[in-house]
Regions:
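Conserved alpha/beta-domain cores
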Residues: 2-157
Length: 157
């Protein structure tokens, strides 16, 4: 099976809530700007950070980069992050601490529902699986083939 993959050679992490970084990100030449709502955002600021995703995705995209949003774990936070991230200017989500196939498939189902509700093409939003545990490392083949959105993975977080 052939599917077209994005060209994502370089990825730059940008905290979605730090204005000075967001403002300059589009000038840095990365293939992907990864707006972070996970570790770089303090817990007390996460709700506000989610409100910034759509607007800041459009801003960092000005230089031609694709935009990915790194989401939180646990599931309750991941769902809120995904709800804030599914929009035409976001090309993908980075799923942190992937635990296995069912984890990926659950989030894939949510993304599809949101894309449909928002009038987007199903499959627009790609996934990067972040393999951060030894258990997930040994499931990497299954994780990377768990859904057609999965286009990349990284090891170590």
């Amino acid at each position: 099976m052939y599917r077209e993959l994005p060209v994502w050679r370089s990825l730059m992490y940008v905290p979605v809530n730090v204005e000075k970084f967001v403002d300059k990100a589009h000038t840095r030449g990365a293939d992907v700007i990864q707006l972070d709502v996970e570790d770089s955002v303090p817990p007390a600021e996460k709700a506000n950070a989610r409100k910034l995703v759509e607007k800041n995705a459009a801003r960092v995209k000005r230089g031609g980069a694709d935009v990915v949003v790194r989401i939180n774990q646990p599931l309750s936070l991941a769902v809120r992050d995904i709800e804030a991230s599914i929009c035409p200017d976001v090309n993908g989500i980075a799923i942190t601490k992937v635990s296995g196939v069912s984890h990926v498939q659950l989030l894939d189902e949510l993304v599809s529902e949101l894309e449909q509700k928002r009038g987007m093409t199903i499959g627009h939003t790609k996934c990067i699986g972040m393999i951060e545990t030894p258990e997930a490392f040994f499931k990497i083949r299954d994780i990377t083939t768990a859904c057609s959105r999965m286009v990349a993975c990284n090891i170590g977080g």
